[in-house]
């Protein structure tokens, strides 16, 4: 299985996020799965790539040329795919993945979550995003989406495109 992971490239995060991210990476690697991610050598991105690599899994890094020129490419990548834009990176990652997981992240991660969900709503693909709600990180997003659903501004039930996993066991059940 190819697992796309969207997440933060920030190093200044809760240390427990790194622990949980490492465990996900180990699960991906030990299971013989492939990580598809943004290729950066910082934050949770580097953490998950290292864990997959060290656990025997394969790592595909989809890297914007701007990042590569800046010297922020992970050394744990087995297959490197260069692209021009963030939009192109999202599409290349989606095309190469069977399932999508979002870990804690910022504006870029939100963009990735919503792009996958919006494209799925319009039948460009049939994938959903599993949002791993580490320590309640995504509680505000889940509340926002529930509120939008209640107000009737969303077509259909958003849960068919975005699902929240509130702990590691729930996440691994969804991935199995």
Predicted region positions:
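A cross-family phosphate/adenosyl-ligand binding-site feature
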Residues: 1-96, 135-176
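Active-site/ligand-binding-proximal alpha/beta "capping" segment
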Residues: 88-123, 130
């Amino acid at each position: 299985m190819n697992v796309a992971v969207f997440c933060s490239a920030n190093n200044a995060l809760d240390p427990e996020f790194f622990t949980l991210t490492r465990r996900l990476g180990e699960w991906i690697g030990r299971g013989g799965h492939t990580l598809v991610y943004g290729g950066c050598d910082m934050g949770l991105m580097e953490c998950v790539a290292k864990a997959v690599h060290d656990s025997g899994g394969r790592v595909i890094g989809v890297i914007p040329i701007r990042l590569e020129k800046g010297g922020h490419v992970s050394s744990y990548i087995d297959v490197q795919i260069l692209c021009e834009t963030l939009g192109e990176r999202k599409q290349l990652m989606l095309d190469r993945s069977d399932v999508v997981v979002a870990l804690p992240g910022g504006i870029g991660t939100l963009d990735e979550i919503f792009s996958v969900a919006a494209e799925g709503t319009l039948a460009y693909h049939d994938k959903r995003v599993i949002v791993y709600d580490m320590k309640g990180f995504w509680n505000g997003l889940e509340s926002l989406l529930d509120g939008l659903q209640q107000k009737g501004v969303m077509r259909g039930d958003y849960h068919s495109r975005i699902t929240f996993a509130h702990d590691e066991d729930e996440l691994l059940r969804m991935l199995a």
